[in-house]
Amino acid sequence: MRSNPTTSGSEVSAVEKKNLGRIVKIIGPVLDVAFPPGKMPNIYNALVVQGRDNEQTNVTCEVQQLLGNNRVRAVAMSDTNGLMRGMEVINTGAPISVPVGGSTLGRIFNVLGQPVDNLGPVDTNTTSPIHRSAPAFIQLDTKLSIFETGIKVVDLLAPYRRGGKIGLFGGAGVGKTVLIMELINNIAKAHGGVSVFGGVGERTREGNDLYMEMKESGVINEENIAESKVALVYGQMNEPPGARMRVGLTALTMAEYFRDVNEQDVLLFIDNIFRFVQAGSEVSALLGRMPSAVGYQPTLSTEMGTLQERITSTKEGSITSIQAVYVPADDLTDPAPATTFAHLDATTVLSRGLAAKGIYPAVDPLDSTSTMLQPRIVGEEHYETAQRVKQTLQRYKELQDIIAILGLDELSEEDRLTVARARKIERFLSQPFFVAEVFTGSPGKYVGLAETIRGFQLILSGELDGLPEQAFYLVGNIDEATAKAMNLKT
């Protein structure tokens, strides 16, 4: 495919206006457009529908198929209401391009990179096409390194890989949003990095709530928007499938600029990766492709790979991606989640049971996993501590039925000690968050990995057996727990 100049959104020069076609067929969000011979657009080029009497309709489409007989099939990125056969269509000669750089921080964009937050135009002339190749092998940084988050339960039991992909599993109301905001806050403070949030096919209300909470917690700075730590890109579930399918690429393009040009560590959030697959399935059916297993598109693995392979570490910087994964009907063998799992380096599972106990972050220490938790990567000390913590919690889980029926007194001395330590560990895995200060009143804590390991080693060794378990609840490092225990005694 020959390379094209890029155009921002629907900017069209006078020269490009010669490349006019006409709509010959409309089927929902899919348009067939006829062009003059020799003026055919390339695959992925952006087309802009011109209204009657030069009235701009602002419907941008993306070429998906070349049908022959000088016709192309394109998918609309916005509503096709009011479009008619015979309307003029401009070939922009380039893929959809979106604004990139520091001026995107604190703003909300749609799939075309247009701001939708009523704060005026974006102060940048730098744009980038949403379709790019993944970095070449020679550019990749193959060194395995931990991405420290400052969140104890994550760093100890399911550590994130720098430039890796993490699946976030959890129902409504278990603290997913607060965890995401804390990660955005911590990457800015500890790594000098920024974040991009891609809302793919989720509820508009949730997107609005997230924006309001980010403003409240300071992740988005209303007074000085340039001091914000995140850019937001939304393609919500009321939008056509074309927009939902491409909004993930828009967010990724913004993240790639921070990695490649600004040489920063970037966090890319995709909520929800299942909706990306779902939108691709809808588009595939509209384009007339034969469906494969469970009605999904035959190109499912290719589409997922095209997105996921661009999320990686290079020698300049890294994009670490956290993707919320909806599992339809809790069926992990469904092709959509199964294809996603092939790309994940770690999973963070949020538990309603822990949230009900008031233990936040409600990350399940036994269900959450990471490929990074190996002695050759994290070191013997970290690995041993994590395994002993998991064994203690697993034994406590096994004993819970006996405790519920017979009571603690019927357990052996050894088991009673295990239960006491497990309850301390469970509480010590909780942590006050910076972004939750406005709700809880207690200051947030960033706990380094070395401090985290030291704290759990002290609990496991029995040195802190004499302290009350409530001293370990919602504290930062272990020194705070011992200080809290002293206060409880007085």
From Swiss-Prot:
Main location: plastid
PROSITE patterns in UniProt: ATPASE_ALPHA_BETA
GO MF annotation, one: ATP hydrolysis activity
Enzyme class: translocase
CC per GO annotation: chloroplast thylakoid membrane; mitochondrion; proton-transporting ATP synthase complex
GO biological process, one term: proton motive force-driven mitochondrial ATP synthesis
InterPro entries documented for this protein: AAA+_ATPase, ATP-synt_VA_C, ATP_synth_F1_bsu, ATPase_a/bsu_AS, ATPase_alpha/beta_chains, ATPase_F1/V1/A1_a/bsu_N, ATPase_F1/V1/A1_a/bsu_N_sf, ATPase_F1/V1/A1_a/bsu_nucl-bd
Catalysis: reaction(s): ATP + H2O + 4 H(+)(in) = ADP + phosphate + 5 H(+)(out)
Membrane-protein topology: Peripheral membrane protein
Keywords: ATP synthesis, ATP-binding, CF(1), Chloroplast, Hydrogen ion transport, Ion transport, Membrane, Nucleotide-binding, Plastid, Thylakoid, Translocase, Transport
Family annotation (SUPFAM superfamilies): C-terminal domain of alpha and beta subunits of F1 ATP synthase, N-terminal domain of alpha and beta subunits of F1 ATP synthase, P-loop containing nucleoside triphosphate hydrolases
Binding site for ATP: 170-177
EC number: 7.1.2.2
Compartment(s) of residence: Plastid, Chloroplast thylakoid membrane
Binding partners and assembly: F-type ATPases have 2 components, CF(1) - the catalytic core - and CF(0) - the membrane proton channel. CF(1) has five subunits: alpha(3), beta(3), gamma(1), delta(1), epsilon(1). CF(0) has four main subunits: a(1), b(1), b'(1) and c(9-12).
UniProt function note: Produces ATP from ADP in the presence of a proton gradient across the membrane. The catalytic sites are hosted primarily by the beta subunits.
Homology family: Belongs to the ATPase alpha/beta chains family.
PANTHER family linked to this entry: ATP SYNTHASE, ATP SYNTHASE SUBUNIT BETA, MITOCHONDRIAL
UniProt cross-references to HAMAP family, sorted A to Z: ATP_synth_beta_bact (MF_01347)
The protein's name in its UniProt record: ATP synthase subunit beta, chloroplastic
